């Protein structure tokens, strides 16, 4: 699109078609009739319990903060073009708990609580493991980049 070129068609707002092909339902905010309602619709979609992407991205960023690399290494490209998760079941499990859901209907975490998620991660065996490992030579041959988290990465 070239600035000032009005020959192009109007762009219709929508949500991520990879997740939902249906058109976005955008209604003006009731308390702001002069608003188009686009930002409100986006905010509601991002925080919707049916949106699986938001808790997965948030969990991945917090994991990246603690371990130096996210469960999805390309945390800025969290989709088909990025890398797949190194531990998809762990990412789903953490995201489900973070959003306040679990198999039993309740979660061990306070829903959407960053503090609870940080506590869960830093008290895990994975976080507390040593940077040295008695089986380091054998593990190094199997997983030289430590993608499987067999030891703690040294960070400054």
What are these regions (language model features)?
Residues 1-156:
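Primarily short, surface-exposed interaction patches in extracytoplasmic proteins
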